[in-house]
């Protein structure tokens, strides 16, 4: 007998992106997991972020953004696994998502970033992107993050020591 699946139980494809950061792994981990209300500006987005909880092993935050057809809300629980990985589970009114992030040192002092995620849309007419379009959009965002991170790293290295 074929097992029935509901719309609620379906997940889409697994998405993947890989980016290199011109910073050491410890700096990349600290930078990537330092969730702040200012993160939207790095993405060129307009959502508002509220940090609900922050401990050495977990960050919980909520994002809220107005759209043409109402509010987009999500709550993300990020489990930190220092020194090089973290896991995120997000629930929202339009989609749920699970993601795994892994950093690996590269021989030249740089860091490789690997992101794998799955999302489950909850709204049938939500903006549909192909797998390639979604991965390309995410890659662009992480390249912007990489540029900001590398600038922050250079700035931190120029600070005078006392």
Where are these regions (language model features)?
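Short, well-structured hydrophobic secondary-structure segments
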Residues: 52, 59-65
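A conserved amphipathic terminal alpha-helix motif
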Residues: 118-162
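Hydrophobic ligand-binding cavity/cleft-lining segments
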Residues: 1-56
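Hydrophobic-ligand binding "helix-grip"
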Residues: 66-112, 118-120
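A structural signal for short, well-ordered beta-strand segments
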Residues: 15-21, 101, 115-117
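A general secondary-structure signal for short beta-strands and their flanking turns/coil
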Residues: 10-16, 58, 96, 108-112
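Short, P/G- and charge-enriched loop/turn segments at secondary-structure junctions
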Residues: 3-7, 62-63, 87-89
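Hydrophobic pocket/interface hotspot
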Residues: 28-32, 38, 61, 77, ...
């Amino acid at each position: 007998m074929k097992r029935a699946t509901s719309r609620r139980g379906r997940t889409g494809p697994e998405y993947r992106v890989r980016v290199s950061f011109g910073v050491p792994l410890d700096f990349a981990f600290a930078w990537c997991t330092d969730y702040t209300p200012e993160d939207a500006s790095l993405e060129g987005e307009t959502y508002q972020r509220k940090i609900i909880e922050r401990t050495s092993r977990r960050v919980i935050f909520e994002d809220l953004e107005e759209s043409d057809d109402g509010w987009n809300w999500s709550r993300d629980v990020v489990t930190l696994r220092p020194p090089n990985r973290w896991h995120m589970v997000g629930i929202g009114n339009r989609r749920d998502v699970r993601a795994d992030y892994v950093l690996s040192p590269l021989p030249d002092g740089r860091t490789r970033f690997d992101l794998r995620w799955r999302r489950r849309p909850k709204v049938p007419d939500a903006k549909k992107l192909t797998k390639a379009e979604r991965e390309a959009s995410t890659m662009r965002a992480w390249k912007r993050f990489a540029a900001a991170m590398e600038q922050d790293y250079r700035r931190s290295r120029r600070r005078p020591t006392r």
